[in-house]
Design a protein with these regions (language model features):
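Loop/turn segments within WD40 beta-propeller blades
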Residues: 2-8, 46-51, 88-95, 100, ...
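WD40-repeat beta-propellers
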Residues: 20-25, 62-66, 106-110, 157-162, ...
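WD40/WD-repeat beta-propeller blade N-cap
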Residues: 35-44, 78-86, 120-136, 173-180, ...
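Solenoidal tandem-repeat scaffolds enriched in leucines and small polar residues
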Residues: 79-163
């Protein structure tokens, strides 16, 4: 799921069957519902840019579609990311797609041309001279810069700077014994929030050499998605224990918790934006 634009008036929803729906918040109704078949597997990322709908699937294929389904010269563009995908993210600020998955390291793509603009290079071998495996699980673009941060199944949080000549991460920090599942930029500069499959959520400082900081408590199941306000110190999260939570970024206090009565397999947080605790805008969906 994702917003269709910065106006946050439409929600893009991609299903496991590759069905795509667009929900308009102003009218309170679905304005689009059609299958967008490409490759194999579930949709792992969906975005919209300049009239084009973009979907990425587990088999590693990304395609741009016209909203109405008719392919134009540019609208039929297909991108082969070179391996299986866990996540596809879009930056409207730079008109760039970011992709990553198992043994398919971070890549950036120009949406206008479909050309690859950046390919991450794996970190050096570990202390035993063994290759460090690659498994990107989530991606986020840092606010106000071209830097991109990723999480991995092996507990790594890595920061890449495509504006430099280096392809390796400029910052890499590991949270021991944690399979990280999601990441979101916080309102604090160069700080991200990460969640793991065991229900651990941390604040990570990506300045200098990187530092794992605050640990937020109250989780029982694995964390599926995190959303942070761009302006206020609040963190929203959903987890496999069917709870939706809001924590304070600095005090670590659990401010709000509610359980869903819906039966579902996974609950995914789309995004949240709020100007104060009393004014919250959160959207969730359930995959049955």
């Amino acid at each position: 799921m994702s917003w269709s634009s910065a106006a946050e008036d439409e929600i893009l929803i991609g299903y496991g069957s590759q069905l795509v729906k667009i929900y308009n918040l102003n009218t309170g109704s679905f304005t689009f519902a059609e299958e967008r078949k490409i490759g194999e597997g579930c949709i792992v990322g969906i975005a919209k840019s300049k009239g084009l709908l973009m979907t990425g699937v587990e088999s590693g294929v990304v395609k741009c579609w016209e909203d109405e389904g008719r392919e134009s010269a540019g609208g039929g563009m297909v991108i082969d990311t070179g391996g299986p995908l866990e996540r596809m993210r879009y930056s409207s600020q730079h008109d760039v797609l970011a992709t990553g998955g198992k043994e398919n390291d971070l890549k950036l793509w120009d949406v206008a041309t479909g050309k690859q603009t950046f390919t991450a290079k794996n970190v050096r071998h570990d202390s035993l001279e063994l290759r460090v495996p690659i498994w990107v699980t989530d991606i986020t673009f840092l606010q106000g810069s071209k830097k991109v941060a990723v999480t991995t199944k092996y507990g790594h949080v890595r920061l890449y700077d495509p504006s430099t000549c280096t392809r390796r991460p400029v910052v890499s920090v590991q949270i021991p014994e944690q399979a990280l599942t999601c990441i979101s930029c916080s309102s604090k500069d160069h700080h991200v929030i990460v969640g793991s499959g065991t229900g651990q959520m941390n604040l990570v400082d990506l300045r200098s050499k990187g530092l794992v900081m605050n640990k937020y408590k109250g989780f029982v199941g694995g964390i599926k998605a995190i959303g942070c306000s761009a302006d206020e110190p609040y963190i929203a999260s959903v987890s496999l224990d069917r709870h939706f939570r809001i924590h304070h970024l600095f005090t670590k206090e659990l401010l709000f918790k509610v359980i869903s009565t819906l039966k579902f397999i996974t609950l995914k947080l789309l995004l949240l934006s709020f100007t104060a605790v009393k004014h919250r805008h959160c959207v969730c969906s359930c995959n049955r």
